[in-house]
Amino acid sequence: MRAEPALLELKLDYRFNDPELLRRALTHSSLANENRPGAGVGSPLNDNEQLEFLGDSVLGFLIAEALVRRFPEYHEGDLSRLKAHLVSAAHLHGVARRLDLGSYLELGRSEEMSGGRTKKTLLVDGLEAIMAAIYLDGGVDAARAFVATHVLDAPFFGDEEAGTDIQPAITNFKSALQELAQTRRLPQPRYSVVRERGPEHSKTFTVEVRVGKEWTAQAEGRTKKIAAQRAARGLYERLMGDPIVPLPDDSPGDSPDDSGDAAESGVISAT
């Protein structure tokens, strides 16, 4: 039994001028294919597939626009990585679940019986269809407001199928910490070498990372780069509130040959 679409409008913070657009955005093709009355059999215009197609492009454009406006100092690579997370199925699935979108979908009997209301693909497709419906109903400003509230400023959603709300296979914690700070609109991480000890051929470095005035972590490593990664991992875990598998000395990108050039690794040597 699906919930009333009017209740979903309250969660979306948007009231449709044309309620038919919302109904169409919530209608899965399985309903039309089962030849139900009023389902618009044989007419692709009565399910959400075309809206999902449009919504995917609307979302990509609005996310890219918002990131360029919010972060004018970021390079293309930084923007691309952040955009990739925000438009990922994992993140959109989390957004859809927060809205309890599955309760509002119109499904055919086969999808209903197979647990379609909780299927990741159906929820993501439905969310993208809703974005398109809002765009068609209220214009780009309405769609922009929805994306800002429900996608850009949403909590950090990762790969829940791996049993956690964070990405389970992080190999570059500096990048992960930077993206997390961006997502939560926190200051960018700042790194500094606070201590060096040991002989020249076998030094140990202590690096501190700070995010604003409140968040900080320190870690040691046999290179500045390894120490920075470990410090980033420590602060990332604190911000996410979840432990992660320890980072080995020779993780990708952290070999001794990369002996930790401060400028390349983002570490600022202490004076």
Swiss-Prot record:
Lineage summary: Bacteria, Pseudomonadati, Acidobacteriota, Terriglobia, Bryobacterales
GO biological process annotation, one example: mRNA processing
Coiled coil: none
Catalysed transformations (reactions): Endonucleolytic cleavage to 5'-phosphomonoester
UniProt key word Phosphoprotein: no
Primary role: Digests double-stranded RNA. Involved in the processing of primary rRNA transcript to yield the immediate precursors to the large and small rRNAs (23S and 16S). Processes some mRNAs, and tRNAs when they are encoded in the rRNA operon. Processes pre-crRNA and tracrRNA of type II CRISPR loci if present in the organism.
Biased composition (Acidic residues): 251-261
Family: Belongs to the ribonuclease III family.
Cofactor dependency: Mg(2+)
Family matches, as PANTHER family: RIBONUCLEASE 3, RIBONUCLEASE III
Annotated region (Disordered), positions in chain: 241-271
Residues that hold Mg(2+) according to the record: 52, 125, 128
Residue ranges annotated for the DRBM domain, each copy included: 172-241
Domain RNase III residues, every copy: 5-139
Protein name as it appears in the record: Ribonuclease 3
Catalytic machinery residues: 56, 128
